[in-house]
Amino acid sequence: MSSHPIQVFSEIGKLKKVMLHRPGKELENLLPDYLERLLFDDIPFLEDAQKEHDAFAQALRDEGIEVLYLEQLAAESLTSPEIRDQFIEEYLDEANIRDRQTKVAIRELLHGIKDNQELVEKTMAGIQKVELPEIPDEAKDLTDLVESEYPFAIDPMPNLYFTRDPFATIGNAVSLNHMFADTRNRETLYGKYIFKYHPIYGGKVDLVYNREEDTRIEGGDELVLSKDVLAVGISQRTDAASIEKLLVNIFKKNVGFKKVLAFEFANNRKFMHLDTVFTMVDYDKFTIHPEIEGDLHVYSVTYENEKLKIVEEKGDLAELLAQNLGVEKVHLIRCGGGNIVAAAREQWNDGSNTLTIAPGVVVVYDRNTVTNKILEEYGLRLIKIRGSELVRGRGGPRCMSMPFEREEV
């Protein structure tokens, strides 16, 4: 194994190191009237969500996996007063603060927080207007008057516990993503600082995509099938143009991959990412949501003579995967056993969104009983976690984790 700080050349190699984010006060800033704006369907109960997340982290540690936390890595990246000040200014610039007085007050509030991790967690939680000095009526501008009912000076980032999406580890490199919605795109700022300034990761990891790009891509659509083959999803959250940029960079930087399988499927919230409908759980086994199979289009992409070569694959998906992975046969394990009711219910509760921590060893939500039973019948060992509150954000174990190091397979 190389000493490189990022080592992810598969979806199934034994997981050695992973990054999570423990849900924080950002969840307590979710309001019913603004759920759609913040990409949520419901409001998790923070205390129970934290208990569930702590149990998830402990289950990983029990398997010998080192657990890192986004909030700690980001705090450790603020290695000088100058970098700390720069972080605050970038955070303010990206927060869409419309009037100067509010921005000045927030800057003062943030500079008053001396502990780096407390500062990072405050930027994640968002800032309510009531935390700031009252602006006198005669000093209010039109924006203040028009938006007087909106409670936040800066929106919270409640999706942060889905660490899979703001950036993706690919081989020894990282795709620092430009995300689908403004409310999530601000999350990528933490990855920028980690991979630029962190004592271990800063300046040591190639970027194969950058958050300054103007087209969208998210980590839930980026899967590392093997040291030679990637899978990417063309989805609600990821543009085909972004995939082309990513692939050109991967091939030009010689990250090590020879081919990409691009999956085009239904563009809607319930199938927001490829990993909500398709994950790899063993050398020759994948979970899949049966509802995507009819409309699925797969394209093979290679890089020849300084340009991308794209071929639409017309054959059977299992045969295509077997051919590209060098195995005799691939088993597609259908969420809900293919039963239309069970499949729809369990896919909504992330029955297809599994985290493989070693070949045939998979972390799942315990609530998806039909799918879990079928996975066990295929010989997989399941590590079942509770997710009654975590699942309200529409993400499962893979969504909640970003591998930093896996053993080679």
Curated annotation (Swiss-Prot):
Keywords: Arginine metabolism, Cytoplasm, Hydrolase. It is found in: Cytoplasm. It catalyses: L-arginine + H2O = L-citrulline + NH4(+). Its main location: cytoplasm. HAMAP family: Arg_deiminase. The keyword Nuclease does not apply. GO terms for molecular function: arginine deiminase activity. The active site is at 399 (amidino-cysteine intermediate). It comes from Streptococcus pneumoniae serotype 4 (strain ATCC BAA-334 / TIGR4). Pathway: Amino-acid degradation; L-arginine degradation via ADI pathway; carbamoyl phosphate from L-arginine: step 1/2. Its EC number is 3.5.3.6. GO terms for biological process: arginine catabolic process to ornithine; arginine deiminase pathway. It holds the Pfam family ADI. This is Arginine deiminase.
